Structures are given as C-alpha cells and as structure tokens.
Amino acid sequence: MDWLAKYWWILVLVFLVGVLLNVIKDLKRIDHKKFLANKPELPPHRDFNDKWDDEDDWPKKDQSKK
C-alpha cells in the first residue's frame, strides 16, 4: 500500500479523464438543432420593480428648485 500513498494522484487523474470522456460522449448525443426547433415558449418575465417605482426618493426633474 506504499505505492498508493505515493501515486494517489494518478488514480485521481484517471478518474477525472474518465469523467471527462463520459461528458464528451454524452454531449455528442445531444441534438441541439432539434431542441432549438422544438423549444417551448418562455412565459413573459415578471419583475416586481414596478411596486417600488412610486416610492422614488430622487427629486423630479420637472419640479422647480425652492
């Protein structure tokens, strides 16, 4: 088991290469053109910033200075 203490990093590299090869293989199976042709419509984006628009603390440009 002395070799394992010395060369543990080689096992980690072999594992990472295996993961990388599996990721590449799986990504090759994805048909991006088919997905883009059939992608669902996104609902309109709802943000709630309009609630704070009335509470604006900045002075209005139209008001004259007092």
From Swiss-Prot:
InterPro entries: UPF0370. Disulfide bonds: none annotated. Residues 39-66 are annotated as: Disordered. Residues 42-51 have a biased composition (Basic and acidic residues). GO terms for cellular component: plasma membrane. It is found in: Cell membrane. Belongs to the UPF0370 family. This is UPF0370 protein YpfN. It comes from Salmonella arizonae (strain ATCC BAA-731 / CDC346-86 / RSK2980).
